[in-house]
């Protein structure tokens, strides 16, 4: 175990499913010293669980982090898009590095397997959406393999029990941010994102299907680029795998994937939450390594 002084001090803002799963991931890492889990309701199950894990908690939200701004260096914001826009006003002024797990789209868009090395000294990194983290690696791989993408559609299906209040309240932002990121990372002329919430019991594992109308000359190159990208994602999301490898018909490419969660806190079927948390941890670990390298030079 590393000395606490060599670890990055972390606060988690948001005590729902994403925040709690992050708590277990952060506590398991030797790179981080988890200082706080902060929510809004003192008697919430999330804050009770955090306290039972010997983590300091508060139900005072952003006000608590303002009062204790010298106690942490990095914040995971797992609230909502609207709340993040308020929260980041303080964090940016205080010089805190924020990893935004909401679809607020304020900071640098990041998918670790694509542009982790490009985030540099950004104050705010946005992880887009769970569907974005699942589909964008494949969209980017297609960009490398085809001449042009005319239209790109992504359909994600998730279990109802893995869709919390914030997810349901942010549906519009989910669509807008995912579609924007798809255009940015793929170069597609038109994009569309669809999220289906499946009430089936037991919960069904997250599945995302990508449809692309594209011009290409070598479909073997499409397969190779997609396969290479899948392996890159699996470096930080081990449960990421294709269920339908690239197939083509009359200029339309179809690819489908599933994500099995690690089961740190969330059930394995909640791959939609696990993938964005794994991405968050990858970004945080990269920033930790960069900061430590800078301190030794």
Curated annotation (Swiss-Prot):
Keyword Repeat in annotation: no
Catalytic activity entry: acetaldehyde + NAD(+) + CoA = acetyl-CoA + NADH + H(+)
GO biological process: catabolic process
Cross-referenced SMART domains: Semialdhyde_dh
Enzyme class: oxidoreductase
A Pfam family assignment: AcetDehyd-dimer
Record-listed E.C. numbers: 1.2.1.10
InterPro entries named in the record: Acetaldehyde_dehydrogenase (IPR003361), Acetylaldehyde_DH_C (IPR015426), NAD(P)-bd_dom_sf (IPR036291), Semialdehyde_DH_NAD-bd (IPR000534)
Keyword Glycoprotein found: no
Family: Belongs to the acetaldehyde dehydrogenase family.
HAMAP family membership: Ac_ald_DH_ac (MF_01657)
Protein name, as recorded: Acetaldehyde dehydrogenase
Native source species: Burkholderia thailandensis (strain ATCC 700388 / DSM 13276 / CCUG 48851 / CIP 106301 / E264)
Origin organism lineage: Bacteria, Pseudomonadati, Pseudomonadota, Betaproteobacteria, Burkholderiales
Gene that encodes the chain: mhpF
């Amino acid at each position: 175990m590393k000395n606490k002084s060599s670890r990055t001090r972390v606060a988690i803002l948001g005590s729902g499913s994403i925040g709690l799963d992050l708590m277990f991931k952060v506590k398991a890492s030797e790179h981080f010293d988890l200082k706080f889990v902060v929510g809004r309701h003192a008697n919430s199950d999330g804050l009770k669980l955090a306290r039972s894990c010997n983590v300091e908690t508060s139900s005072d939200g952003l006000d608590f982090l303002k009062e204790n701004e010298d106690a942490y260096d990095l914040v995971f914001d797992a609230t909502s898009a609207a709340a993040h826009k308020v929260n980041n006003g303080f964090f940016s002024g205080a010089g805190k590095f924020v990893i935004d797990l909401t679809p607020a789209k304020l900071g640098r868009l990041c998918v670790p397997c694509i542009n982790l090395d490009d985030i540099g000294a950004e104050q705010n990194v946005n992880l887009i959406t769970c569907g974005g983290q699942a589909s964008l690696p494949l969209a980017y791989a297609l960009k490398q393999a085809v001449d042009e993408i005319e239209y790109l559609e992504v359909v994600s299906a998730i279990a109802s029990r893995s869709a919390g209040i914030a997810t349901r309240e942010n549906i519009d932002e989910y669509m807008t941010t995912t579609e924007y990121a798809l255009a940015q990372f793929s170069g597609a002329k038109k994009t569309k994102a669809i999220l289906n919430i499946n009430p089936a019991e037991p919960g069904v594992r997250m599945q995302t299907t990508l449809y692309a109308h594209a011009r290409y000359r070598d479909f073997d190159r499409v397969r190779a680029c997609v396969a290479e990208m899948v392996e890159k994602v699996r470096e930080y999301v081990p449960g990421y795998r294709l269920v339908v490898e690239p197939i083509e018909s009359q200029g339309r490419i179809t690819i489908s994937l599933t994500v099995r969660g690690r089961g740190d806190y969330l059930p394995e079927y909640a791959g939609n939450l696990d993938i964005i948390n794994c991405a968050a941890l990858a970004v945080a670990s990269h920033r930790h390594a960069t900061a430590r390298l800078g301190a030794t030079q």
